[in-house]
């Protein structure tokens, strides 16, 4: 492509880029860069849009040349103040319509404000954008081999690959006629404009089968793909976090209802049995006492065991509820008055006491029992029960992170073997008592079957707890970076580490993050760099890897959830149902949020809602 052809292509591309920025404020379009920029007004308006600053007063009706020069000079001075190099260009060049210098000026603005997310200097921006293209099209090699911003794009397949990689629902790459370059490129341009919102900055004939297309025009257009898909990835991640957070809340809500209902039922059953024991009457004969004894034994073998299991299950259920809330640093669940574990323990303690009294009442009528055998069995049974209770309490009061809890539960499981041996010894004593006709024991409330049952429950609880914790750890391990992803991060770090000091400066840090699809505005980027550098001159490889993992993984934290809602709400302080649905949050999730989230005059107040859910001693960090 000859110089005049490049200039013509750049003129069309840069004019379209210019107009996409002006259209955001419904400003008049540019038709001829040489004439329409000569009074400096549109140039100032463009800078106010892309720089998000007010340049102050300027001549809005510049009739004289000196007024036009003043306007253009104001724009150029602003550009210089932002550290952008301006070589051999002055106000007169713009006023006089020097197209070559005007195109160079616009290219400087494109580098700074469109590709500045990667770096402020063109060379690094080019390398970072090229590396992003290569990473995203790696699965389409060798048909797509992006080595530059000229010949690598002439068959249209690179554009199609970028779209298919991010939005496979819009384009079936495998059905493309790889030899029909013009049709492929036209298809990619149409989909990008109509379905993704990427402005059509270049034409098919500017790129398709051209020996060497204009590099700057293609870079400008490809940068629009970079920004569009980076935003798409961010919103999808945010929606996924919102869904997972809400699903945990919904599940926890159901568990709370289940806990309260079952707790009421268990406490009621215990109270009714206690009332029965208060009113029971004994007849002075063996048959009646034996009948009471049999009924009592039946109760212990059936209902009481169900209560023991239910009691342990309720304690475990409450622990699961608190673990779910703690995962997101939410406020601890406080059961209603009378339905707390302490209430159950108090009534259970009274129940056990009255159960013991009932047992003693029956046993007073059974004088044929040998005292020594009773004591021998009772001592071992009570000791075994205490050991089981100790293990149950250890499980109920687990603390620490997932790994610490798993290690502790596995430690408890190792003690089940000696307990099983001890249980066998208890059975020997129990069998001896049975053979001697000893059916009741005032020194213990436990039979061998009770202890065996509780031992089985405890063993099952431990096994289920281990399985639960292992699954949670496995899920968390799944969220970590794969070796391939870690290799990719290492490659990016080494690529931008220019001084080979195992450290990235601020410019290299921004470029490396952007090549991984992590883009921030100036304020966010600066804050992230200083946090990563930690008072050092730059960011080390270890800190860079940690930062990337923190930003890419789906962490369970209030801060991530808050940022997720902010992303779904497009930065607003409130989120609407349409925002949630548009981000592909499921309708049932949206309905739950509508019913439970604080109301805002224009939508749902997610910030206040999340703060209310936080534990009182927790902050969003």
UniProtKB/Swiss-Prot annotation:
GO biological process, one term: actomyosin contractile ring assembly actin filament bundle convergence
Primary localization class, coarse: cytoplasm
Annotated localization: Cytoplasm, Cytoskeleton
Location of the EF-hand domain: 388-419, 487-549, 550-618
Keywords carried by this UniProt record: Actin-binding, Calcium, Cytoplasm, Cytoskeleton, Repeat
Pfam families in UniProt: CH, EFhand_Ca_insen
Gene Ontology MF terms in the entry: actin filament binding; actin lateral binding; protein-macromolecule adaptor activity
InterPro entries listed in its UniProt record: Actinin_actin-bd_CS (IPR001589), CH_dom (IPR001715), CH_dom_sf (IPR036872), EF-hand-dom_pair (IPR011992), EF-hand_Ca_insen (IPR014837)
Keyword RNA-binding: no
Keyword Repeat applies: yes
Ranges where the record places region Actin-binding: 86-110
This protein's GO CC annotations: actin filament bundle; actomyosin contractile ring; cell projection; cortical actin cytoskeleton; mitotic actomyosin contractile ring
All residue ranges annotated as the Calponin-homology (CH) domain in the record: 8-114, 123-230
Stated role: Binds to actin and is involved in actin-ring formation and organization. Plays a role in cytokinesis and is involved in septation.
Family statement: Belongs to the alpha-actinin family.
Protein name from the UniProt record: Alpha-actinin-like protein 1
Organism: Schizosaccharomyces pombe (strain 972 / ATCC 24843)
